[in-house]
Amino acid sequence: RDVLGSRGLGDVYKRQDYSQVKIFGADESPAQFKDAFRRINELFITEAKKYNVGKQLKKEVTEISLDAVNQVNENIDLTELMTAKREYTLSKEQIKAAINALPIQKTPGVGMVFIAQFLDKSNNRGTYEVVFFNTETKEIIEEWITDGKARGFGLRNYWAGSIYSALKKL
C-alpha cells in the first residue's frame, strides 16, 4: 500500500500499542503478557532489519520511538487483558482514543502504530489495527485491520511472529 503517497514523510514511528488488546485461549498470566509486550517492542530496535516497516512501505523511517507506547502499555489493566470471547474488534472510537492517548511531541510528520486488537492462541493469530496519523494533530490519515500467524518459541517470540507475518502484508 502506498498510504503516504506524495505526502512528505517526516518522522514515522513504528510501535506496538497493547493498551486495547484482548487475549483468548492462552495459559500465560496477564503479567507475563505485559512483560512480553515490552520485550516485543524492543525487537523493533534490536532486530530492526527483520521488523523493518520502512522497507515494507518503501519509505525511509527517520525515527523509531518506543517511549509513547511504552508509557501507555505500562498502564494496561491486567484484569481486563484476558477474555472468554472468541472474537474482539476495536471500535473507531477506541482507535481514535488510543491515538489521542499517545504522549507524543506535536511535531510535523506521520506516525504509524500497530494497535494490537486480539491475540487468539486457539487459532495462532494476532489481529492488529494499522494506523497512520498526523503527529501534530493526531488526525488519522488511514487505518486498516491486518493479522498474522503466531509462531516461535516462548511467549515473546510466538506473538512477535504474528507481528512479523502482519508486517509482510503492508
PLM regions: where:
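Solvent-exposed loop/turn segments at secondary-structure junctions
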Residues: Y18-Q20, Q117-S122, G148-R151
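Short, hydrophobic/glycine-enriched beta-strand segments
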Residues: D11-D17
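Mature extracytoplasmic/lumenal regions of exported proteins
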Residues: Q94-E139, E143
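Short secondary-structure boundary/capping segments
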Residues: V12, D27-A31, T127-E129
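Solvent-exposed, acidic/flexible segments
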Residues: Y88, K92, G126, G152-A160
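N-terminal segment of the mature soluble domain
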Residues: Y18-T107, G111
